[in-house]
A protein has these predicted regions:
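Conserved core of the PLP fold type I
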Residues: 80-225
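Short, flexible segments with low predicted structural confidence
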Residues: 11-15, 68-69, 110-112, 124-125
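Generic N-terminal amphipathic, Lys/Arg-enriched alpha-helix
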Residues: 5-25
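N-terminal small-domain helix-loop-helix segment of the aminotransferase-like
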Residues: 2, 6, 25-119
Length: 225
């Protein structure tokens, strides 16, 4: 394992051992090389003609570009349009996003990292798989689910998908009882439960009452160990 990965694991283990315990083997080994970040930062400060770290040509203090492309953008500057996007999203956006998360989820005085921008939902799901899913893990999903979950988690990550009935018998409500039964039947220490609402393909979103019931189930399971 890389020394950088060991350092990151040590930091995370001390800061939040619960989150560290959830990481997959791959999640504990992956890291961002320090050279890429530091060299890119230096280039932004000192590269006047050509930034060789990403192969970008500069002109008049900004990136070289074609006016025929620039004309399709309104109030954005060339520096906001043409260079490579940052790997995690714009820092200003991520800071505002974190403030929104804290204000809407009663997290005042809680320390959380900056959220990360992903390239649409599928990329986010695969990053989640990279960081948290090991071969043989069980992922609990409703029987009415997006077909790509099979490709992502069962085929790519070799996890076992466990289904529960999404609707009750009258097909009018989220089946809280079926979810509870499925989770109670799990005999593994690690449980992965994936929610994505509105549900694909049904379009259904649980009511506030159903959401509270789901929360109660998860809290009971967590407290029971």
């Amino acid at each position: 394992m890389s020394e950088i990965a060991k350092e990151m694991n040590k930091f995370l283990r001390e800061k939040d051992p619960v989150i560290f315990s959830l990481l997959s083997d791959f999640g504990r080994e992956i890291y961002m090389p320090k050279g890429i970040i530091s060299q890119s930062a230096e280039a932004k400060l000192h590269a006047y003609e050509c930034n060789a770290t990403i192969g970008i040509a500069k002109e008049d203090g900004g990136p070289m570009y074609l006016p025929s492309i620039k004309k399709f953008f309104n109030n954005l500057t060339p520096s906001e349009i043409f260079p490579y996007a940052t790997p995690y999203g714009l820092p200003e956006l991520r800071k505002l996003w974190r403030e929104k998360i804290i204000s809407e989820n009663e997290l005042k005085n809680k320390e959380i990292s900056l959220p990360v921008v992903t390239h649409a939902m599928t990329n986010g799901l695969m990053l989640t798989g990279d960081l948290f899913i090991d071969k043989g893990d069980e992922i609990y999903l409703p029987n009415m689910m997006w077909g790509n979950y099979n490709l992502i988690y069962r085929i790519r990550y070799k996890a076992n998908i466990v289904n529960y009935d999404f609707f009750n018998s009258s097909l009018t409500k989220f089946n809280v009882a079926a979810l509870k039964e499925a989770l109670n039947n799990c005999n593994k220490e690690k449980v992965v439960l994936l929610f994505n609402f509105p549900n694909n393909p049904t379009g259904y979103t649980p009511t506030q009452k159903e959401a509270n019931a789901i929360t109660e189930i998860l809290l009971d399971l967590a407290e029971s160990g």
